[in-house]
């Protein structure tokens, strides 16, 4: 008798753990695939590696944080969009009218289609930035700043699409 109770409790515990993820992702169980189109860089100022880095990071996030299978097209969840802005602007000026601090901003337009739960679909722009000292040569830190901003953008997109906290 104890054996049957033990098996029942173990089974219930095992199945109840399957409903939750540590990422907080809330994806319908019928959703099995995801397609993420290449995000073209349509910004006025183009950074050549940004499109590929951004697209790869978005794909990696969903591969690592969900059980969805990545497909080239026609996924149950679909992402497409473009990089709409890549900009470096001064944010702090000293008494000699020179910049003390600059800001690198990246803006991305995302179209998300959820074919299983259409009410969760959206079209939205996401914008993130990183500030840096103007005395530092941008070419020495640009890729690191870009990586930092991409991580923030990807987290925002992931949370908006599949996390309902």
Model-based region annotation:
Residues 14-56, 60, 67, 72, ...:
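A structural "domain/chain start" motif
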């Amino acid at each position: 008798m104890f054996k049957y109770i033990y098996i029942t409790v173990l089974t219930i515990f095992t199945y109840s753990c399957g409903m939750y993820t540590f990422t907080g992702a809330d994806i319908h169980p019928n959703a099995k695939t995801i397609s993420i189109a290449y995000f073209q860089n349509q910004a006025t100022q183009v950074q050549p590696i940004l499109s590929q880095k951004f697209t790869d990071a978005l794909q990696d996030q969903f591969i690592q944080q969900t059980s969805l299978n990545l497909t080239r097209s026609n996924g149950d969840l679909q992402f497409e969009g473009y990089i709409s802005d890549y900009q470096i602007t001064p944010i702090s000026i000293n008494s000699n009218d020179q910049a003390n601090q600059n800001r690198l901003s990246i803006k991305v337009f995302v179209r998300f289609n959820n074919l299983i739960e259409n009410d969760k679909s959206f079209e939205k722009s996401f914008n993130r930035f990183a500030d840096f000292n103007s005395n530092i040569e941008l070419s020495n830190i640009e890729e690191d700043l870009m990586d930092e901003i991409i991580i923030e953008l990807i987290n925002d997109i992931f949370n908006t699409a599949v996390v309902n906290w």
